[in-house]
Amino acid sequence: MHQSRTITYAKAEFPVTTRKMDELQDVQLTEIKPLLTNKNARNFQDFDCQEHDIETPHGVLHVTMRGVPKGNRPVILTYHDIGLNHKSCFNTLFNYEDMQEITQHFAVVHVDAPGQQEGAPPFPSGYRYPTMDELAEMLPSVLTQLNVNSMIGIGVGAGAYVLTRFALNNPTLVEGLVLINVDPCAEGWIDWAASKLTGWTSNLVDIIMAHHFSTDELTDNQELIQTYRLHVAQDINQDNLALFCGSYQYRRDLGIERPVVGLNEDTVNTLICPALLVVGDTSPAVEAVVECNSRLNPTKTTLLKMADCGGLPQVVQPGKLAEAFKYFVQGMGYMPSAGMTRLARSRTTSSSSITSMDSSRSRSNLNSLLEGTAAGNLDNQAGPQTMEVSC
């Protein structure tokens, strides 16, 4: 059963704030002024959206759609992390002015994990929350009932895991993935958080905060921390959140493996779509993202590290992520005539390289966007070459 309701909001007057995949590379972006201020710290609003409750094999999913699917183009489908919902995880990014040019070309589908949406009722006693694999198995029903043929996914943390699992199971439905703070491994993050933070209690809100933010952020960025602590504690049903966290804690390893030419490229379990991995350089997820990077095809994967940025780059640095996403989408052949972002126009770039014929082809579109930038030809076993971008 597919139920929908349409909610239309007035347009916001305030600003609410890359590239084709190539050889494995590590891009570092320096910090610009964070978006979050006292004026708009809780910029979680939806604008011009339709809400849908969609039946799937593992229960009902709450989905919010912005815009209408454009012909045969994919939709941008998002999936949030634990302790968040689509509003708190993605609306700062999608309400940012530089993203508006992108969303003119694509409909956006925000998926809330079961029971995590704003105002969600508690689950009945004895309810079994879907496993992470089952959460991925719910997504084909969303695409089918919204008459969507394919998607470009943006996932954060647990949501990045779900979208990766979905892409592994349904490669023809996924044209590209932006994976923020993705962890491909099976070990539980709760034990990790407890081991890293002495003196902290087992309070779920505290553990969620340790999952999202570095110790420096927890100390130094009080406005951001207070905003999200209140959100986790007050806006998300705590019983439902505990179930989602339990599902994420007991996830399976994704089982992905880097393909080796002439050995296993036809049989290895890995993503076949372009992937952009994103992590702040002080994020608790850095090691996990680097591990994921080491398992993916370097000719289709880019690792982007945001300098001086912590656990929520899409919230703290939406301008940087909007720019990166624009280049990513253009690299897949969409929006070829779109202009540079304001950030790109003010950028200076530097790097060094020797480029092979194959790697030239794989990154030619990217280099045309990052003017004056050349990238290194990297062996599968070599560490990533760093390309520093200042602005």
Predicted regions and their residues:
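Alpha/beta-hydrolase fold catalytic core
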Residues: M1-I76, Q104-F106, Q330-C391
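Conserved acidic catalytic loop of the alpha/beta-hydrolase fold
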Residues: M132-I152
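Conserved serine/cysteine hydrolase catalytic core
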Residues: N237-K305, T349, T355, R363, ...
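Post-His helix in hydrolase/transferase enzymes
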Residues: Q314-Q330, M335-P336
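Histidine-bearing beta->alpha loop at or near hydrolase active sites
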Residues: M306-P313, P318-G319, L343
